[in-house]
């Protein structure tokens, strides 16, 4: 889970909010399912569930419009832009009719998730009552659906760092120091950091792993020494820092290019 910036309400929703709300109050129609609402929400979340960060189908097939404050309890907010979030079916179902006003949970467009939850061994733990309630209500430590995917991408991240570090160490020692290997190190590191960006699936997991990985720190130091760590790498790393759900063991932002 990462913080998201909510854009302004779609102009069409501004024009139709009163009419759609009245329609829901009168006959209970699913007025929140308008394509322009779904598309705006998907754009806001980079096509991901705001809670678990799983990828949502681009055609909205598997995306559900989640009401942060439940529509049955707060019907006048049924299409209020600030009450709508894009969610996967699993998270929307787990949250159900939970009243987030009476028992607050994290709203990723309002709160900074890392202030309330942390990651340990690919499981999420609450740092305060809001964080604990969020983890419990959304069942964010479901082993098969969430913890296992985090572990897989975390393991893949660690393996990628190890491969890049080995290439960088050899390059630094003038072993196989070809232009091709240089390009593989540069582009491989760029792609690795892209996986920690807000638009990538499970970006919080990737970012958290990188900022707690000694090999990644070594990789960065060697790349700086060999003058192949560039401004794009630094920018991507700075962006990734905003997504971490751990207290970093290493200050990866030191030794800036």
Curated annotation (Swiss-Prot):
Primary role: Component of antiviral defense system Septu type I, composed of PtuA and PtuB. Expression of Septu type I in B.subtilis (strain BEST7003) confers resistance to phages SBSphiC and SBSphiJ. May be a nuclease.
GO molecular function: endonuclease activity; nucleic acid binding; zinc ion binding
Organism annotation: Bacillus thuringiensis
Protein name: Septu protein PtuB
GO biological process, one term: defense response to virus
TM ranges: none
SMART domains: HNHc
Superkingdom in the source lineage: Bacteria
Domain HNH: 49-96
Keyword Hydrolase: yes
Keywords for the protein's UniProt record, in alphabetical order: Antiviral defense, Hydrolase, Nuclease
